[in-house]
Amino acid sequence: MVRICLDCFVEKGLTVATTKDLCKAAKLQNGGIYYYFSTKEEIVLACAEEAISRIEKGAFAIVLEDIRDIKSMMDHLGELADKMSPTMRFLVSVCVSREYGEKVKPSLARLAARYPYYTGRIAEILGCTDKEVAPFVHLSILAINNYMIFAERALFDPQIEAVKKELSRLAERKGRNNR
């Protein structure tokens, strides 16, 4: 149900999608959505959590699969950013909303708390320390987030090129980069 609602919010927008739209998308009678959720706020926050999950799983699946070929990994992350841009924009609209902004912060904090795990996995694969790779993990996250929000390559390419260069250098130092 959450996935259907998120797709509806992504398509129509946070402020435009009505509970009637959500019911229609879920093939429910008007008001039927409240069988699954108590309030619209509960729906929005569940959808924000799902948006975070989609973006996180998509991005880190690519990273952990392609990290040995850094150029390919960054290309795939750019493609994912193009695809996930509408989802990120929905998430941003929730985060900046007066109604939901404070309430979504715990979900964002849980996401940020998972970054050290990903940093550790990337460092392990590349054969370097967490401390060496952490700045580039965070710069990549920032660049991809900015690109998904603003859909402007000029904000993305310079940061990603810097990350590619430095991650490749780290990987080559350990003989772990295929490119």
Stretch-by-stretch model annotation:
Residues 47-73:
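Amphipathic alpha-helical linker/stalk segments
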Residues 1-6, 78:
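A short, Lys/Arg-enriched amphipathic alpha-helix from helix-turn-helix/homeodomain DNA-binding modules
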Residues 70-96, 101-105:
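Helical hydrophobic small-molecule/effector-binding pocket
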Residues 93, 128-151, 158-169:
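Hydrophobic alpha-helical segments that form the core
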Residues 56, 60-61, 83-86, 100-127, ...:
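Amphipathic alpha-helical packing segments from all-alpha helical-bundle domains
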